[in-house]
Amino acid sequence: SLVGSEMCIRDRKRVLFSVILLLAAGFTFAQEKTVKEAKSIANEVNPDFNKAEQLINQALTNPETKDNADTWDVAGFIQKRINEKQMENAYLRKPYDTLKVYNSALNMCKYYLKCDELAQVPNEKGKIKNKYRKANTAAIVAERPNLINGGIQYYNLEKNKEALDFFGTYIEIAQNPMFEKENFLQTDTLLPQIAYYASLAAAKMEDYPSVLKYAPYAQNDKEVGQYAMEFISTALKAQGDTVKWIASLKEGLQLSLIHISEPTRLLSI
């Protein structure tokens, strides 16, 4: 009968829907297993980092796992282990790769920052349960100086894009909520210098948005502030923003007058 046929069709749809749900659950489980396997490999005494990175890179792009904080936490952990192994070789006076030390530090920082961003998203009850922040903050703070070393190394190799990546990440850490207690914007005396080098690397590539992003962190510094203002003015002129360009020239002139008058004022006291 017609009713019987409709019921039969509905039952088939229900079965099909159940199969799809089971398949989806299976794919999710498989990807989560991949993440755990990647972490397990990285934790071994002699880790196969190529295998661990291959597995985690799949998870970082897979729709089932790419939005999970845990995926990015494991990605950061793998880079941390790569860094530790290189430093272990250095300590034992075995051959080690300096650039690998710097790049693993950079990648670790980026992955942990992304992990924190995802972990700060409220759950279905509107609560934030970020179990990663404390350990990952400590790891980033410990490795942050290597971002300067890596940036300088690439800058000296005239690889401005890579240098900017290092210097830019160093600056972005300073303003990230993860590091509220460290208060880097106020306590980090190297920040203006690194912002200057970030702006310089960006200016060499004519990457004016990056110049305007990083140069302001250096503009009030006594040593490099005037150069930072020149970078800002050049970038604004290149972008055709005449009003802001003229304003930046005036500001740059005022800063240079302040810096010129300060030694004179000290001599007159």
Named regions from a protein language model:
Residues Q31-M87:
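Start-of-domain marker
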Residues E37, A75, I82, G150, ...:
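Structural register within alpha-helical repeat arrays
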Residues I78-A195:
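Short coil/linker segments at helix-helix boundaries
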Residues S1-D11, I258-I269:
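Single conserved hydrophobic/aromatic residue that forms the stacking wall/gate
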Residues A30-T34, S104-N107, A142-L147, T187-Y197, ...:
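Generic helix N-cap/helix-start motif at coil->alpha-helix transitions
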